[in-house]
Design a protein with these regions (language model features):
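Terminal helix/beta-alpha structural elements that buttress the NAD(P)+-binding lobe
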Residues: 1-25, 32-64, 69-70, 75-346
């Protein structure tokens, strides 16, 4: 089958047609890749080799498609079902930059009728990362409820990116008023996702804190840094400005590489979506248990339209080779819209 191969860390992506089609194992499904999205993690893995389990490797982790074969023990899916989600990163057979890929049954989403195949490809990695940060890390209950003027705030740093937009949506869905940070040019993206207010992340930290204080009046105890660059702002906001009567204040971040100094009364959580589908460590087992437990509710909210796909830009025509164009375009992409590629018509 065709795919986009990477021979080594620091190498170039190239199109091949000699890949072996994967075979689903127990509790796995084989999916025909119809649309795949481009994420920052592909460039990270290409440059560093991290998260890659074997070379050469096909990358890509975010896609939508059609089930063409089910492995032993699968009960959720049947051949012909439309599915999407985030696959196991850096693992042969599971990558989405190829014609067919594997998914673990309990980590895959059923596509709602009201979501297009292109839209579905924008959801998996961003929504799951946001859910790990907001629901698991910041301990927000995954339950649909209306907010009021008395509701506490959830602060989302880096709210205009794909993870940030889903974090904003989750916060609003779960009854929080949401304050998001972004560049001023992306304020409308943040508000369209559901944020009640936004502020400029380019301000110096003290000015960001003053803005947070003015908007929230200290009625918050949870901050999620979707940008991986907001640790100082988030922690200082919680220590200096947050509701001091809260027994615990929560800071979660997508920065999973820089240690965070423990502070009294502050719970911290570093999101590691790179562990999706992996096994062998207590951490990986817990992360996958968390993801699997959230997917049914997330599916329900997507079906009801309470969570929405991201806006997207489709790159190129139809075909696996178009992924090369999208990877190149991603290097200069700043619009806040997801880049997607259609590999096949159906």
């Amino acid at each position: 089958m065709k795919g986009i191969l990477l021979d080594n860390a620091g190498g170039d992506f190239h199109l091949v047609d000699t890949l072996e089609e994967p075979t689903p194992g127990r509790n796995q499904i084989l999916v025909k890749s119809l649309v795949t999205a481009i994420n920052p993690v592909e460039g990270f893995m290409q440059g560093t080799g991290q998260l890659v389990t074997a070379w050469p490797i096909v990358l890509g982790c975010d896609a939508s498609g059609t089930v063409v074969e089910v492995g032993e023990g699968v009960t959720k899916f049947n051949n012909g079902d439309a599915v999407f989600g985030c696959t196991v990163l850096g693992t042969p057979g599971h990558s989405t930059f190829q014609e067919y890929f594997l998914m673990n049954e309990n980590l895959a989403f059923k596509k709602p009728e009201g979501v297009t195949t292109e839209q579905a490809a924008t959801i998996g990695a961003g929504l799951l990362t946001a859910a790990l940060g907001v629901i698991i890390g910041a301990k927000v209950e995954l339950k649909s409820q209306e907010s009021t003027t008395e509701s506490p705030w959830l602060i989302v740093l880096g709210a205009a990116g794909s993870v940030g937009q889903f974090a904003v949506q989750l916060g609003k869905l779960c009854g929080y008023r949401v304050l998001g940070s972004s560049s001023p040019s992306n304020t409308e993206i943040v508000k369209a996702a559901g944020a009640e207010a936004a502020f400029d992340y380019k301000l110096i930290v003290n000015e960001q804190l003053a803005t947070i204080k003015q908007i929230t009046n200290g009625n918050f105890s949870r901050v999620f840094d979707a940008s991986a660059m907001g640790t100082e702002t988030g922690i200082e906001a919680l220590l200096q400005l947050a509701d001091q009567s809260a027994p615990v204040r929560y800071f979660s971040t997508t920065n999973d590489w820089a240690p965070i100094e423990p502070r009294d009364g502050l719970a911290t959580h570093q999101v590691e979506l790179g562990q999706i589908g992996r096994s062998g460590t207590e951490k990986a087992e817990q992360i996958n248990k968390d993801i699997a437990s959230m997917i049914p509710k997330l599916e329900e909210y997507l079906e009801a339209g309470l969570l929405r796909p991201l806006e997207y830009v489709q790159v190129g025509d139809v075909g696996v080779g178009e992924i090369l164009k999208a990877l190149e375009a991603f290097n200069n992409h700043r619009s806040g819209k997801k880049l997607v590629v259609r590999l096949a018509e159906n």
